[in-house]
Amino acid sequence: MHSILRSSLSSREALRMRQLKGLRKERPGRHPLGVRLRAIWTSFLFPNPPHSGGKLRASTAAVEEHQEWSMDLPEGQAGGPTAQMYLWEQPEEASSRPLLSLEEQILNSTFEACDPHKTGTVTVAHLLAYLEAVTGQGPQDVRLQTLARSLDPYGEGAGATVELDTFLVVMRDWIAACQLQGGLERAEETAYEGALASPHLPSVCPEAEESANLESFGGEDPRPEGPATAELLSNLEDLELSNRRLAGENAKLQRSVETAEEGSARLGEEITALRKQLRSTQQALQVAKALDEELEDLKTLAKSLEEQNRSLMAQARHTEKEQQHLAAEVETLQEENEKLLAERDGVKRRSEELATEKDALKRQLCECERLICQREAVLSERTRHAESLARTLEEYRTTTQELRQEISNLEEQLSQSQEGPEELLEGAEAGRVGWIMALPPSLDLEIQAIRQEQDVASAGLSSPLYGVWQWEEVEPEPEPEPEPEPEPEPQEVEFPSEDPARQQTDLQREPVRALEGSRAPCLRLSRSQEEEEEEEESWVLADPSSPLGTYHHKLAPGSSRESCHIVPEMHQALMPVVRDLVPVERSRTQHCLHPQHSPGIRISQHPLVPTPVLGLLLLLLLSILLFSQSPPPTWPHLQLYYLQPPPV
């Protein structure tokens, strides 16, 4: 609809421009500028209607042109006061808006013509150029200059722009000012025509009317003022004829206007029907567009649903495969579950068995603890007894020292025995009897009783430790008796002594023949001494740092001290648990309980020494050996070990 309006406006503007050009060609000598301005400002930009009751005071061409342009108006509005309320055909979208007047429609059309790109702004220079082209005025026109100042109040020049709202407001004010100025000019023209008109003539001179009209539009009359009355009368008849002719033409024009009004009414009805049809068509088009959009949406939805269906089908196939795989896994898991249940039953049975074994082991452990407590009591008793024996040993050592001192005295006496052997023999016999009486009579018996008690205690006490080797005693091997020496040569006999560095001097430097009676006690003494040494060496090596479950090795008679450092083998039946009941510091090395052997006292028998002296000396040496014997091995530093339960 906008394009139709723009095309109709442009066609009408072109028609008017052609009519203006025709007027210029028809009346070149009758002020074409004034006629053209009056026609344009009246019909296009300034639709000022003529006053009611007034007469048409324009030339014939101007009247015809004005009537021709008035045919565009609806019926009853051509040249009337309702011309400015003429309504152009509005688009369907603008039917709800208030109806625009002819002035607003013309202004909108002018702005749209200057703004073909629909930017909403137009330069002032472009608008002025368009108005100059339409009106035919130049930039020197006062009214156009006033309009330019109104559109460009800040004097920006060629870069000034104006919007539609500003353009409409400024143009309305400018048109009102031009209409006011035009009304004053028409009042002056009417007064001038009344002065020239004759009361007997129906009309005045057409030249005077034309001059007045031209003056009202700013034109000038070049003819000389005050023509002769004769000439006026001669032209009066011509004017009357032309008036009649114009009246006939006016009647024809009235009939054509009526016909045009009827046609306009029919066209209005057709336009209304077309508008209704256009409205229904637009509604149907909108419905069709909506349906088309819905159809496109449905197509898109259908495509998406198809894609979802395909994806769901693929997912269903994949899910079915997974279900089959899961079913196989479930069967496998069921089989494994059955196996695990069987294993669980076996484990339960094994747990019950282990619980039974655990209870038995607990009972054994309690029994072992009870036995260990008893053994600890026995060991403490033995430790106290060992301490008492150690004190007794110290007393014996003191006595041994005294005896050594006495022996040294005897050696001195023996050195002097050459002078008085008889007296020496008697003194030695008396000293022997006194020494024997001084010795404790039950020393040997006490030692034997102590050994027997230890053997009975070790045999009577049941050991709580499983797989423990018992203490062993090595029986002394009998040694062959030494053969008696046939020759009475001086013999050297070694006797044990406390001090290894001390060397005894010979008792007699002269050889003395030994008698058979005196040789036999010496042999018995040497044999008993060897047996005692073997017994002492046969004691088991005790390692305080080793547990009670280890194997103990006996010390052979001919073995050295290094042989006692033998690594014991652990019994594999039970694992010992360490519990130190006696807080005793243990050394990291193994220790051997070996008998303390005192170095022997070398005595050289002189053949001149009498037999009683030798017997006395042998008796003294025997007593020294008895006193210097080491006590049997005890367990003062024995550590106790509990047993761990066997591994499952």
From Swiss-Prot:
Q: What is the topology of this protein in the membrane according to its UniProt annotation?
A: Single-pass type IV membrane protein
Swiss-Prot/TrEMBL keywords: Chromosome, Coiled coil, Meiosis, Membrane, Nucleus, Telomere, Transmembrane, Transmembrane helix
Q: Where is this region: Disordered?
A: 206-228, 473-545
Q: What happens when the gene is disrupted?
A: Male and female Kash5-null mice are infertile. Testes from Kash5-null mice have a reduced size compared to those derived from wild-type animal, have a normal tissue organization, but the seminiferous tubules are narrower and present a great decrease in germ cells. No spermatids and mature sperm are observed, indicating spermatocyte arrest.
Cite the ranges annotated as topological domain Perinuclear space.
628-648
Give the domain section of the comments.
The C-terminal 22 AA is required and sufficient for localization to telomeres at the nuclear envelope.
Q: What does the annotation say about its assembly with partners?
A: Core component the LINC complex which is composed of inner nuclear membrane SUN domain-containing proteins coupled to outer nuclear membrane KASH domain-containing nesprins. SUN and KASH domain-containing proteins seem to bind each other promiscuously; however, differentially expression of LINC complex constituents is giving rise to specific assemblies. At least SUN1/2-containing core LINC complexes are proposed to be hexameric composed of three protomers of each KASH and SUN domain-containing protein.
According to its UniProt entry, what is the function of this protein?
A: As a component of the LINC (LInker of Nucleoskeleton and Cytoskeleton) complex, involved in the connection between the nuclear lamina and the cytoskeleton. The nucleocytoplasmic interactions established by the LINC complex play an important role in the transmission of mechanical forces across the nuclear envelope and in nuclear movement and positioning. Required for telomere attachment to nuclear envelope in the prophase of meiosis and for rapid telomere prophase movements implicating a SUN1/2:KASH5 LINC complex in which SUN1 and SUN2 seem to act at least partial redundantly.
| Identification of the protein by name | Protein KASH5
GN (gene name): Kash5
